[in-house]
Amino acid sequence: MVNVKASMFLTFAGLVLLFVVCYASESEEKEFPKEMLSSIFAVDNDFKQEERDCAGYMRECKEKLCCSGYVCSSRWKWCVLPAPWRR
């Protein structure tokens, strides 16, 4: 009888250990895509500062200059793409 109880206890302890290991590895796998996306879309503070110095497409250009490749629309005061029909 003692051997049966010991083997049942060891089996139960093994199943609990297996559950803990599987849960830990699954939670790491769930965090991996989040970490990957955050590293892909991470932006340096220097780049953010440069981006704030000029106004991008469809941004107000009253106080800021438009970024390169855009011009300030005289009518709407937005940064737009330069075109032959725009004055």
Curated annotation (Swiss-Prot):
Disulphides: 54-67, 61-72, 66-79
Keywords, in A-Z order: Disulfide bond, Ion channel impairing toxin, Knottin, Secreted, Signal, Toxin
Any Pfam family matching the protein: Toxin_12
One example GO MF annotation: toxin activity
PROSITE patterns: HWTX_1
Residue numbers covered by the propeptide annotation in the UniProt entry: 25-52
Tissue/organ expression: Expressed by the venom gland.
Segment forming the signal sequence: 1-24
Similarity annotation: Belongs to the neurotoxin 10 (Hwtx-1) family. 51 (Hntx-8) subfamily. Hntx-8 sub-subfamily.
Domain notes for this protein: The presence of a 'disulfide through disulfide knot' structurally defines this protein as a knottin.
Job description of the protein: Ion channel inhibitor.
Stated name of the protein: U3-theraphotoxin-Hhn1a 17
